[in-house]
C-alpha cells in the first residue's frame, strides 16, 4: 500500500514537471502573485537560463540532491499527497535573474529574511485540487506565504494538515497571552503591595478616629440634604433668581446714573433706587440677625440633646453665612455711597454739609461691621425669656427641681447645667434684690403705721434683710 502511494506521488510529480512551460511558470513566484510558491529550493539546481525551467534538469537535480540522498525521515509521503521538503539554508548565486522576486537577507544568508537563530519549518507541497492555504505565520510578517488559488490549480501549504496549523496558531497565541498575563500580574502584585502598605499606615494612625467622626458628620449632612432635595428645589431656585436680580440691580450701568443729571426725572429715579438700596440693606441686616439667632438656638438644642461640643458642626456654617453677609453688605454699601456722591454733584450744597452727610451715612453702614464669627456672650434672648417666665410664675420657690430642669432645658434649647447656672445667678441678681425691696417697702409701711398706732404689733424683719441694711450702712 505504501509503495503504491509513493509511486502515485512521484508519478504525479513527474507529470507535473514534464508538462508544458505555462503551467510550470505558475510554479515560479512573481510580484503579482508572490504567494503561489513558498517552498525553498536549492539555488544550485536552478540554472541561469529561465527557459530551461520546463525540462527534466530541475526535476532530476531535485530528486538527486533532496529526495534520493536524504534520510527516510526527510521524505514523508502521505495519503493526501503531501510531500515535505527539508532544505538547509542555501547560498544564492550572484546576480540571478530572479533575485528581485525573492526576499533575501544578505547579512544572514537567509533567503526569506528570517532571523539567524531561527530554524526552517517543514514545507509540504500539495498536488491537485486543494482548499485555500492557511499559514502558521501572521500576514503582517510574511504576506507572500499566503496563497488563495482557485480550484483545480496548484496550491502549496506550510503544514501537512489544517489541525496542525490550528494547533500551532493556538500555541503561539497561548504563549503570547501567558506572557502578557505574567506582566500584568506582576504589575498588579506591586500595586497590591503599595495599597496594603498605605492601608496599614492609615489604620495605624492616631488621627483615624477623629477623621472618621468628621466624615460621619459630613455624610449625615449629605444624606439629610439629599432627602430634602426635592422639597428645597423650588426654594433654592427662587433664592438663586432673587440673588441674580439683586446682582443685576447692583451691577447696573453706571453711565446711566452719571449722564444727563440736568433732568429731574433721572434724579428722582436715582433717589428712589438709593432708598430701595437702604431698605434692602436693612432687610439684609435683619435677616442675618435672625439667621444667627436660629443657629445659636440649634446649637443649644443639639448640646442639650447630645451633651457634645457643637463648635465642630457650627464653625463652617457661621463662617460661610458671615462671609456671604459681609460680601453682600459691602457691595450694597459701595453702591449707596457711589449714588450719594453722584447725587451730591447735582446739588448746590456746601462742603461741610456733604462731609457731614457722608459721615452719617458711613456710621449707619458700619453699624454691624464687626467680627461675626466671634462667640456670642450670654444666652439667647428666647431661652432667657422662657426661664424668666418660669421664675416669676414660681416666685416663692424660684429654684426648679431635676424634672423641671429637664423640661426647661427642652423648652429653652439649653442644657441642664446651663439652666441650673442661670437660676443660681438669677436668684442672686434678680430674685434676692426684689425680695429685699419688697420687705423694705413693707417695713416702711409698718413704721408709718406704728407712728399712727404706737401700741400696734410690729413685724419681725428677716435676717437677710437686716444684714443687707447693715451692709448698706
UniProtKB/Swiss-Prot annotation:
> Where along the sequence lies the DNA-binding region?
372-434
User: Single GO cellular component annotation?
Assistant: nucleus
| PROSITE patterns on file | HOMEOBOX_1, HOMEOBOX_2
Region spans: Disordered: 448-473
What does induction of this protein depend on? By light. In etiolated seedlings, maximally expressed after 3 days of illumination.
The record's region (BELL domain) falls at: 266-336
Q: Residue ranges of region SR/KY domain?
A: 205-221
Compartments, record wording: Nucleus
Please verify whether the record's keywords include Transmembrane helix: no
GO annotation terms (biological process): floral organ abscission; meristem maintenance; negative regulation of cell population proliferation; photomorphogenesis; regulation of gibberellin biosynthetic process; shoot organ boundary specification; vegetative to reproductive phase transition of meristem
This protein's domain notes: The SR/KY and BELL domains are responsive for the interaction between the TALE/BELL proteins and the TALE/KNOX proteins.
Binding partners and assembly: May form heterodimeric complex with the TALE/KNOX protein STM.
Record-given protein name: Homeobox protein ATH1
